[in-house]
Amino acid sequence: MDRGVLPLPITLLFVIYSFVPTTGLAERVGCDLQPVDPTRGEVTFTTSQVSEGCVAQAANAVREVHVLFLDFPGMLSHLELTLQASKQNGTETQEVFLVLVSNKNVFVKFQAPEIPLHLAYDSSLVIFQGQPRVNITVLPSLTSRKQILDWAATKGAITSIAALDDPQSIVLQLGQDPKAPFLCLPEAHKDMGATLEWQPRAQTPVQSCRLEGVSGHKEAYILRILPGSEAGPRTVTVMMELSCTSGDAILILHGPPYVSWFIDINHSMQILTTGEYSVKIFPGSKVKGVELPDTPQGLIAEARKLNASIVTSFVELPLVSNVSLRASSCGGVFQTTPAPVVTTPPKDTCSPVLLMSLIQPKCGNQVMTLALNKKHVQTLQCTITGLTFWDSSCQAEDTDDHLVLSSAYSSCGMKVTAHVVSNEVIISFPSGSPPLRKKVQCIDMDSLSFQLGLYLSPHFLQASNTIELGQQAFVQVSVSPLTSEVTVQLDSCHLDLGPEGDMVELIQSRTAKGSCVTLLSPSPEGDPRFSFLLRVYMVPTPTAGTLSCNLALRPSTLSQEVYKTVSMRLNIVSPDLSGKGLVLPSVLGITFGAFLIGALLTAALWYIYSHTRGPSKREPVVAVAAPASSESSSTNHSIGSTQSTPCSTSSMA
């Protein structure tokens, strides 16, 4: 019975025993590898190996600092950047400072759900699709990587550094690696482990050849994984997808000794691997691998032993995490890459989606304004002949760096409701190309008023501008007038205790920061609310602070958000402890008084005892001195405590 037509479960578990090829056969297999037509097959992979990088753990750090150096060959590239939070052992991801350094223009599709984040980048090179809901820091003009790393180190302990060549997508896993060293020193060809995985944009070269003297149509797919910089146990996931439903095929996987395989295939195949492997439909069953030659010709010779007539796909890759092999057909059709044909690339490769993402209107002072960066338009290779509102007589003004389109609310076809202003923007191109149209809306901030109120009870009855240390505070952001056109959310809040104090984070990325900050239900009118408990242990104790909240506002008919910051000045007072407890001077005074009274009483009792008992022989008195440093040590510890966080557990006494 032909093995190639065995039922899938049987053939997936079929183990090929090791065959040791002779040297002559390995050198003379009669199979000249040639590049394959890209339309005949595709190989994609993700890897954690970067051209240069490092991973470190920042002990006791409140902020992670990650630095990505992006090197692109073309004038414009696209990148998908995803940040994933780690919640090992139930701990939340701490604050993150991410530095993006790019050598060319890049459009970034960014995802970072519910992660407190600061981004530092050069806005003239890095363009985000949609405004990221994070804190932005302008990257200073620095000329070398060392200068950038020195600057990044001032923001906190560096957790990871990675240099990537032409990435298409990056997944950065946040959190501390307990096995990493405490210092991040970049190394060439570094394996970033679970911290970072990325997919290169460059097409993976695939080779193929026909084995001389072998008849039939049995195909071989060979994947060779090259060793990485670090030898550690690793499982490589291989997804093999063939479009045909019948045929005889062989899959040969070769890798370093520490690599095992998890195989996901949709076709009956013979499997030959180094290292143990398991298949998706039987994940619990592991099959031992065999010893295979460590050369391309040796692996081809193994395919020949299994009666393969064609090596349909031969691929060599660096140490990868996942690899996907797709073949458009099978059954013995062999086709190498055709001779290149000289073609003239189209002059206009403008992306309408990316161009329209640059249209971001702003409203204020009864005027809608949008500015289109001319450099970004040129980077997109777009040629614009006109930028107007719905009323074509309202045209953009051409400045040195921007095309600026603006209009009062009363003209150019503006549609104005109580709090939202809308219009249509039309972008015209040279003759022959249809214009692009985009409906734009923005919130009229002048029509809304915002007030930040502090209350001392959960009933929110009487506002106050004074907070007592150790007392729970209740905060409400009031928006007037009431409207259903705009929804308001608390994006972030913090309490600034001044230049000599701390910045106390209360809310980050719409999530309570700490166990003593609580997001409350909105008011009956829909106003956002939260509460916090502040205990400050600083010398001297701060007497004032500034409470600031960043609000995210969104029109009910639009997904794009705008932001508004509201602040209020707070007075901070120490609690009146007359009926609640004793402060440190009182405690010391009472202690000294009690000691003095006790000493006098002891002396009096000893005097009475010594003069009233009989003249019997007295025993010697032995005095044991208490350590003199105990009291001063306690005092020093209380003075040295400096901390300000919501619901801090530090102590002053």
Curated annotation (Swiss-Prot):
Where do the segments described as Required for interaction with GDF2 lie? Answer: 27-337
Q: Region annotation OR1, N-terminal part: residue ranges?
A: 27-47
Annotated ranges, domain ZP: 363-510
Localization recorded for this chain is: Cell membrane
Instruction: Name one molecular function that GO assigns to this entry.
Output: galactose binding
Result of knocking out the encoding gene: Full embryonic lethality at about 10.5 dpc. At 9.5 dpc, embryos display abnormal yolk sac vasculature and yolk sac anemia. Mutant embryos are also anemic, probably due to defective hematopoiesis in the yolk sac. In contrast, the embryonic vasculature appears grossly normal in most cases, but heart development is abnormal, and nearly all mutant embryos had enlarged ventricles and dilated outflow tracts. Besides, many had abnormal cardiac looping and displayed pericardial effusion.
Sites of Phosphoserine modification: S641, S644
Main location group: membrane
Report how it sits in the membrane: Single-pass type I membrane protein
**Protein name, per record:** Endoglin
